[in-house]
A protein has these predicted regions:
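S-adenosyl-L-methionine/SAH cofactor-binding core of RNA-modifying enzymes
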Residues: 2-79
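Helix N-terminus capping/helix-initiation residues
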Residues: 27, 58, 105, 159-161
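Glutamate identity and glutamate-enriched acidic tracts
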Residues: 9, 15, 34, 54-56, ...
Length: 179
């Protein structure tokens, strides 16, 4: 993945490092300089996961692209189409593909792309929950503003490790703790 200038290995979760994530701070069109196994990427060989893409990511796309870009500019709800910045910066290099019409958290988009491309599970066969409500007590809950994949064993949204603990800790704070 291409990360902001100044990023070091210490900034990347150890779980991703142990999984062998490849990352750089180079621009997308120069990935081949850092990763010799990437030939110079030509037009239309990068898949940009984008809620405004023209078609859905499909199992056959594993053969169509050398790189899949996701989670580059997640953040706003509702989305502000900041992915357009990448499309404008690299015209012709990127092909926009959707993972449905709703914004996902970065980890969910990664998991969804993995299911589709690596496990060959069609998008329509993946079970999701949209805007799940996470309850901490009888009176306290948080609505997550994204789409999540459902864990079929627990029937709950799959969240990043530590997310519930962090949200629970945040729920114990008062407004005074923020200043």
């Amino acid at each position: 993945c291409s990360l902001p200038a100044g990023t070091t290995e210490l900034d990347i979760p150890s779980e991703l490092i142990s999984l062998g994530i490849q990352w750089t701070t180079l621009q997308l069109d120069t990935l081949h300089k850092e990763f010799p196994n990437f030939t110079n990427i030509q037009d239309k060989q990068m898949c940009l996961l984008d809620p405004r893409g023209e078609t859905e990511l499909s199992c056959t796309d594993i053969n169509n692209y050398k790189v899949c870009i996701l989670g580059g500019i997640l953040g706003s709800h509702p989305p502000r189409d900041r992915t357009k910045e990448l499309k404008d910066k690299y015209p012709g290099l990127l092909v926009g593909k959707r993972l449905g019409s709703l914004q996902m958290s970065t980890d969910t988009a990664c998991r969804c792309a993995h299911y589709i491309l690596d496990k060959q599970i069609p998008f329509e066969n993946i079970k999701f929950i949209d805007y799940p409500e996470i309850r901490f007590s009888k009176r306290e809950a948080v609505e997550m503003p994204f789409r999540y994949i459902i864990d079929e064993n627990t029937n709950k949204p799959i969240l990043p490790d530590g997310m519930l603990k962090l949200m629970n800790k945040d729920s114990d704070q008062s407004i005074d703790d923020l200043f």
